[in-house]
């Protein structure tokens, strides 16, 4: 066998093993999520699932209408006969969630003999304070309007199936896929870093405020042949850089597919480009998009473009039929209505498909999530490059959805922050981090100026995670809370870092029985929660607005406890677990560490990148609340962090009598 044939065999073996490994991971992650979800659904009654935010009970059908793609959308609202008030209780539902719609017998005295169980699947399209909208797979799934219903969150198997399908395609020997970029991305060769100087010889920047590192990233990404990695630490203007790259590529007559790991990441780029005049379209359900970018959504463009009047007219006819379905129990009448709806839907989809194809084909830039890149609207579309934002937060199979067959990719992210949030026993390395390690500085551009944090707040993350290369911009390095309008100068507002040290009093897990039931695998610390409340009260008294404050903690149980204490004081601020605040920023961040024990166990905080996310959210003020005796001795890394706090923060030693 010749050496070239041997190499082909080696490459093919590598590809198959690579694909099998990712498919195995997808299967493991899906099984873990399904098992956990089914365990909760079986273990707890619907009333408890509602209190956990995983279900909504005692609902009735409100409005029935037609949505994008001719889908039947039902608004479910609270049934006043069984509920107090009109607003839905607090919940964790969001657009895109897969749900089960079930007949609610649980709070009834008993199930009637002629009643049958209803279990219909749908996808959440909108969550309003008074109703939740769900798109059904079929109009024949519409339950009776007289039925009391519940909506329960399920695992979204479609996302896993799309990843699995993509990796199966990855393994197929299709010449179109096996290009130079493909072998670079799987680690079989170094990236081709040849530069087309003609593309950047006379470059003029749209954004005149770009710094030197941003300009370097723009020029490299435009001119490099196949791969660019933009490493953007917190507050370094990664989105501004990507916007400039897109504008420059379009100016050079390139067609771009822009993807992100989240809807918000994609929408932020669309928002910045909305006034550029570039022909562009945002794929995805409008309920998942920022209101400011809806005019660029495929849904709005299809209803206002060619055939828009026809599409709206058919949609109105379908809505009339849908309203009749919920008002009749007669089987013959319902079958006749369903027949009419099916005919109307055929016409709807015919006109819509033609309109959508024209809109997408005419767009120089197409935006979607990574999963959205596998939608039918993009089938057969060709692009000169793909840009993936938040690439460090995406699973490898997600990234391959838009990448198969592409010749050039620009990945942006920060592998020093949290990696993809998946339920797996194995540590997961994103494509972005893998390529940073394997391809090195040849293809990496580091954004080194941050525009968010006071210099003291950014010092530890810069020294620890970014080789001391992350520097604050002049306009942010000295700013404090007291510099804000209407904020008084106090010890709190004059300090960039505050540290309440609970000094080994071991108050961890001071939870009620209810809290233990709802957050079995979570932790809380009542004492720290009281300190959070105390500190926030001090900031508010100094004139800081509640909207400028956020509470961050590693545990959902602590979030619930703090929210409860603040509610008693009439205080409402944004709060969340560390995993949910990545990408966010506030003037002041209060960080409750929770763990306080004599075995020096720090739990979630053992992941260094989780700490990096938490302490890089604030602009002017970081307040840390925790037990130095537990945290400091957990590892050398945490020893260094506590030493930094003790040397640079205002330290308040707290004893157990402070809040008695």
Swiss-Prot record:
Location in or out of the cell: Cytoplasm; Nucleus
Q: Which UniProt keywords apply?
A: ATP-binding, Cytoplasm, Helicase, Hydrolase, Nucleotide-binding, Nucleus
Molecular function GO terms recorded: 5'-3' DNA helicase activity; ATP binding; ATP hydrolysis activity; double-stranded DNA helicase activity; RNA binding; single-stranded DNA binding
What span is annotated as the signal peptide, if there is one? none
For this record, the Gene Ontology CC terms, alphabetical, are: cytosol; DNA helicase A complex; nuclear replication fork; nucleus
Asked whether the keyword Amino-acid biosynthesis is assigned, the reply is no
An example GO BP is:
mitotic DNA replication lagging strand elongation
Write down the EC number: 3.6.4.12
> What positions does the entry give for ATP binding?
232-239
Highest rank taxon of the organism:
Eukaryota
Write down the InterPro entries for this protein, in alphabetical order. AAA+_ATPase, Coronavir_polyprotein_1ab, DNA2/NAM7-like_C, DNA2/NAM7_AAA_11, P-loop_NTPase, SF1_C_Upf1, SMUBP-2_HCS1_1B
Q: Which reaction does it catalyse?
A: ATP + H2O = ADP + phosphate + H(+)
Complexes and interactors: Associates with the hexameric DNA polymerase alpha.
What function is annotated for this protein?
DNA polymerase alpha-associated DNA helicase which may be involved in DNA replication.
Entry-linked PANTHER family:
DNA-BINDING PROTEIN SMUBP-2 (PTHR43788:SF8), DNA2/NAM7 HELICASE FAMILY MEMBER (PTHR43788)
Q: Which family does it belong to?
A: Belongs to the DNA2/NAM7 helicase family.
Identify this protein by name: DNA polymerase alpha-associated DNA helicase A
Naturally occurring in which organism (per UniProt):
Schizosaccharomyces pombe (strain 972 / ATCC 24843) (Fission yeast)
């Amino acid at each position: 066998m010749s050496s070239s044939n041997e190499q082909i065999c080696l490459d093919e073996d590598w590809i198959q093993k690579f694909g099998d490994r990712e498919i195995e991971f997808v299967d493991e992650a899906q099984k873990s999520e399904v098992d956990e979800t089914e365990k909760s659904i079986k273990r707890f009654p619907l009333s408890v699932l509602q209190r956990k935010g995983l279900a909504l009970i005692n609902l009735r059908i409100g409005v029935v209408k037609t949505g994008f793609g001719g889908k039947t959308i039902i608004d479910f609202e609270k049934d006043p006969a069984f509920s107090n008030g009109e607003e839905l209780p607090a919940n964790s539902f969001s657009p895109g969630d897969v749900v089960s719609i079930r007949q609610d017998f649980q709070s009834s005295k008993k199930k009637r003999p002629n009643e049958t169980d209803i279990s219909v699947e749908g996808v959440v399209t909108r969550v309003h304070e008074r109703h939740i909208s769900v798109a059904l797979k079929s109009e024949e799934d519409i339950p009776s309007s007289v039925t009391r219903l519940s909506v329960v969150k399920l695992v979204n198997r479609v996302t896993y199936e799309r990843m699995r399908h993509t990796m199966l395609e990855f393994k197929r020997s299709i010449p179109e896929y096996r290009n130079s970029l493909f072998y670079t991305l799987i680690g079989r060769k170094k990236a081709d870093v040849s530069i087309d100087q003609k593309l950047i010889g006379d470059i003029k920047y749209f954004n005149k405020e770009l710094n030197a590192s941003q300009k370097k990233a723009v020029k490299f990404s435009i001119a490099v042949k196949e791969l660019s990695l933009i490493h953007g630490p917190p507050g370094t203007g990664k989105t501004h850089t990507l916007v400039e790259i897109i504008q420059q590529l379009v100016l050079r007559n390139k067609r771009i597919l822009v993807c992100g790991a989240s809807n918000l990441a994609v929408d932020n780029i669309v928002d910045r480009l909305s006034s550029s005049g570039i022909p562009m379209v945002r794929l995805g359900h409008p309920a998942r998009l920022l209101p400011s970018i809806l005019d660029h959504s495929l849904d709005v463009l299809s209803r206002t473009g060619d055939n828009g009047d026809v599409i709206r007219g058919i949609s109105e006819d379908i809505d009339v039929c849908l309203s009749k379905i919920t008002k009749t129990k007669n089987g013959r009448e319902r079958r006749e209505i369903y027949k009419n709806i099916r005919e109307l839907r055929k016409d709807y989809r015919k006109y819509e498909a033609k309109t959508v194809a024209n809109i997408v084909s005419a767009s120089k830039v197409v935006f979607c999530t990574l999963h959205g890149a596998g939608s039918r609207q993009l089938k057969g579309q060709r692009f000169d490059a793909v840009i993936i934002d938040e690439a460090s937060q995406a699973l490898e199979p997600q990234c391959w959805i838009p990448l198969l067959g592409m010749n050039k990719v620009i990945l942006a992210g920060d592998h020093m922050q949290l990696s993809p949030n998946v339920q797996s026993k194995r540590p997961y390395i994103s494509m972005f981090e893998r390529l940073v390690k394997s391809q090195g500085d040849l293809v990496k551009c580091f954004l080194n100026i941050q525009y968010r944090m006071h210099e003291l707040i950014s010092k530890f993350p810069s020294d620890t995670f970014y080789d001391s290369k992350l520097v604050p911009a002049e306009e942010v390095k000295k700013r404090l809370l007291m510099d804000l309008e209407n904020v008084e100068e106090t010890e709190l507002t004059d300090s960039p870092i505050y540290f309440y040290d609970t000094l080994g009093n071991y108050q961890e897990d001071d939870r009620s029985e209810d809290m233990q039931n709802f957050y079995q695998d979570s932790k809380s610390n009542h004492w720290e929660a009281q300190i959070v409340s105390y500190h926030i009260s001090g900031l508010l008294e100094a004139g800081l607005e509640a909207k400028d404050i956020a509470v961050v903690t590693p545990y959902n149980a602590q979030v619930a406890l703090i929210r409860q204490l603040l509610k008693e004081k009439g205080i409402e601020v944004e709060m969340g677990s560390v995993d949910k605040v990545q990408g966010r920023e506030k003037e002041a961040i209060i960080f409750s560490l929770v763990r306080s024990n004599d075995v020096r166990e720090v739990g979630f905080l053992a992941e260094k990148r989780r700490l990096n996310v938490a302490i890089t959210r604030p602009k002017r003020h970081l307040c840390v609340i925790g037990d130095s005796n537990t945290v400091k001795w957990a590892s050398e890394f945490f020893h260094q962090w506590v030493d930094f706090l003790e040397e640079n923060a205002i330290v308040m030693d707290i004893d157990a009598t402070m809040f008695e």
